[in-house]
């Protein structure tokens, strides 16, 4: 079963055409090849800090549940990797940003609550795993079928590198699913940075400037 975006409060989305894809995204499309996606019970994976959880994150999570659930025809599984404080420190140049993330256990609880609500219309189950490196279990688990990735160039490069790594290890490449950006009221995409800067709220509504 697919979720109605209007019912979840998602704002309009911005379509990313193939001519706008980064080099890595174009390249990984040639590497998909054989996968287990024909199976009714599928496993989709994605990862991030998910702090604060905003409508852009929700679009990614919805896509993961849709992919794993096979539109309601299978009992799939979603793996959500949550960035550890150590990984956040390694990958974020601004220490203030890392401090603003809050305790890992608190972030995990908030994410679990969100997943309970978002996953309700779907048949797939979910689990949250700790991410201590950028690839996480997606690089090594043979039971994973699909990766849900942001359209951001950095995320697409990692998806391409991940499939290269899996092929080198003798694993099937993952099918990559990339939902379009979710944009705020001003037509610019929703991001955690904009929320932290006080420009918008987690739903993309513009906040009054002082």
Feature-to-residue mapping (PLM):
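Nucleotidyltransferase catalytic core that binds NTPs
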Residues: 1-210
């Amino acid at each position: 079963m697919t979720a109605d975006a209007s019912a979840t409060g998602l704002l309009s989305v911005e379509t990313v055409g193939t001519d706008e894809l980064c080099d890595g995204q174009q390249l990984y499309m040639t590497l998909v090849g054989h996968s287990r996606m024909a199976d009714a019970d599928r496993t989709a994976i994605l990862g991030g800090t998910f702090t604060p959880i905003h409508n852009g994150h929700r679009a990614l999570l919805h896509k993961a549940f849709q992919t794993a659930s096979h539109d309601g025809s299978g009992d799939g599984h979603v793996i959500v990797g949550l960035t550890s404080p150590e990984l956040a420190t390694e990958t974020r140049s601004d220490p203030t940003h890392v401090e603003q993330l809050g305790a890992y256990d608190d972030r995990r609880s908030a994410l679990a609550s969100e997943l309970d609500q978002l996953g309700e219309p779907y048949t797939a189950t979910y689990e949250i795993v700790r991410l201590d490196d950028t690839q996480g279990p997606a690089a090594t688990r043979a039971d994973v079928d699909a990766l849900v990735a942001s359209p951001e160039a950095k995320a697409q490069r990692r998806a391409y590198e991940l499939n290269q790594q899996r092929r080198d290890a003798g694993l099937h490449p993952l099918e990559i699913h990339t939902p379009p950006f979710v944009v705020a009221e001003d037509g610019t995409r929703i991001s955690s940075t904009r929320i932290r800067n006080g420009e918008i709220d987690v739903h993309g509504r513009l906040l009054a400037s002082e």
